[in-house]
Amino acid sequence: MTKTADLKGSNFTLSVLHLPNDDITQALSMLEQKVAQAPSFFASAPVVINIENVSNEINFVDLKLGVERTGMIPVGITGCKDKEKQAQATSAGFAVMTSFTPQQVTQKANMQPTKVVRTPIRSGQQVYAKDADLVILNHVSPGAEVIADGSIHIHGTLRGRAIAGASGQKEAKIFCKNLQAELISIAGNYWLSDQINKEYWHQNVMVTMVEDHIKIDTLTL
């Protein structure tokens, strides 16, 4: 039996670049700095650009080229109700995306058994627990990446990147015995190392999402 192409809806987590004002050059410079801090995480990653706070005319071709120079792939704009601007963005190759309140992601019924890794996760390695929690009974080196659709438990030092709730589960958490991360992320919201308050550095912590913002708590047990 011949199989045919099938078009289905799906959910993806996308980074959003919020332009705070009309100074697009400054925003692109900031983006370039962020990408330089975690190039393997941002390389060829799709990004949506929120232009809600931009009042002046936008050269969408230059904006697209500027984002591409950072190594990310601009896929769309949001925060724009002006039909003329929407048409200009479309002509430049952007999709026009409307904001919506996403439905709560419920995965518990589909979750698989926890994935357990006993060996160190070395630089350049990536471990992904699809539809599952991930337990690392060792250290995560700089340049390594651990990803889970559920929560991540690291019984060692996290020096690389930890990405929990990769499919959008905001209830996901990250636990680690010694936080020295290059990046922590839950449901698409992320902090780079310079955003992590030094009081949590080298500490036993729990990372959660509260009202769409990352929160870190020190664990005393």
From Swiss-Prot:
**Keyword list, A-Z:** Cell cycle, Cell division, Septation
Family matches, as Pfam families: MinC_C, MinC_N
Say which domain of life the source belongs to.
Bacteria
Asked if Oxidoreductase is a keyword of the record, the answer is no
Q: Carries keyword Cell division?
A: yes
Question: In which family does this protein belong, per the annotation?
Answer: Belongs to the MinC family.
Q: Which HAMAP family did the record assign?
A: MinC
Q: What job does the chain carry out?
A: Cell division inhibitor that blocks the formation of polar Z ring septums. Rapidly oscillates between the poles of the cell to destabilize FtsZ filaments that have formed before they mature into polar Z rings. Prevents FtsZ polymerization.
UniProt name for this protein: Probable septum site-determining protein MinC
Species this protein is from = Aliivibrio salmonicida (strain LFI1238) (Vibrio salmonicida (strain LFI1238))
